[in-house]
Amino acid sequence: MSDIPSNEQIRTALDNAYAYAKTVQGGKNASYIPALAQVPSDLLAIAVVTVNGDLLTAGSADAPFAIESISKAFNLAYVMDLIGMKQLRAKIGADPTGEPFNSVMAIELHGGKPLNPLVNAGAMATVSLVNGSDSDEIWGNMIHNFNNFANTALTVNQEIYKSESATNQHNRGIAWLLDSYGYFYNTPPMIVDLYTRMCSLNITASQLALMGACYANGGVNPVSKKRVVKEENVPPILAEMCMSGLYDSTGDWMYKAGLPAKSGVGGGLVAVAPGKLAMAAFSPPLDPAGNTVKGQAALQSIIRELNLNLFRS
C-alpha cells in the first residue's frame, strides 16, 4: 500500500466528489419508517478522517441522522472483544445470506442459526450477547462503546426511536424465531428494544468518519488515542463489511469500490481504507437495496481519485 494521501489530495478529491454527487439522481427516502421519510432529501454530506486524526468535510457534515444498520458494525466490535472471534462465529456465523437484510428465509434454511452479524437477525443476536444484568446496564455498555468510537456522547433520536418501535413487528418476529431455535441469548422483547435504540442513535458524517477511522487505524481512535477494539478483531470485522456491508448489493459495491463499507437506511455510509483513512457520506435517498445513492457515488469518486481500492496493485 502507498502512503496516506496528503490533506491537499483529499481536499481536492472531496470537493470533486461533492460536486459530482450533487448531480446524481435517483433513489427515495426509506418509507417503511415514517420518521425517515420526512428527512429532507436534498441533504448531502461527506467527511474523511485520516489515521493521523485529520478531518476534512464537504456539505452538511454536522447534520445529524439516524445511524441505523451502520451501528451493527460497531456493536459487533464490542461483542467480539467480549467473547472472542471464534465463539462469536460459532453462535452467529460469518457468511452472506444472499437475502434482504430483514429476511427470515435465511434463518429457516440454515437450522435457525443467523448467518452473519450485519443483517437484522445476526445483529439482534449480537445485541443479545452484550453483557449486563438488566436493560439499563446492557445499554450502558453499548453506548459507552459507541461513544469511544465517536469520541463524543451520542444521543438517541427519540422521534426515530418511537417511529421504529411502533413499526418493528417484523424484527420482533425474527427475534422470537431465533429464540425458538436456541440462537438468541437474552429476552427477545428487551433485546429488540435495545437494538431499536441502537439503530436510532444520532450521528453526523464527521462523527461516522471518525468511527470508521478507528478501524483504519488498527482499532485505535486516531483522535482520542484510545484503543476501542482489539487489533486482532479488526480484520474479521472488515471482512464482514466486505461480505455484507451494503445488504444484498454488497457485491456490486465491492466490484466498484473495493473497500469494506457499511450502510444504513438513514442514508449514511462509511468506508474504510486500512492504514490510511475512513470516509463517510450522508444522503437520504436510497436505492432498492436500501443504500444511499449519492453517498455511494461520492465515496466511489474519492476511492477512484485517491487510488484506495484494496485490489489495485
Swiss-Prot record:
Reaction(s) catalysed (UniProt annotation): L-glutamine + H2O = L-glutamate + NH4(+)
EC class name: hydrolase
Domain of life: Bacteria
Record GO terms (molecular function): glutaminase activity
Entry binding sites for substrate: 69, 120, 164, 171, 195, 247, 265
InterPro entries, alphabetized: Beta-lactam/transpept-like, Glutaminase
EC number(s) given by UniProt: 3.5.1.2
GO annotation terms (biological process): glutamate biosynthetic process; glutamine catabolic process
Keywords from the named record: Hydrolase
Signal peptide span: none
UniProt keyword annotation of Hydrolase present: yes
UniProt similarity note: Belongs to the glutaminase family.
Subunit structure, interactors included: Homotetramer.
Protein name: Glutaminase
Lineage: Bacteria, Pseudomonadati, Verrucomicrobiota, Verrucomicrobiia, Verrucomicrobiales
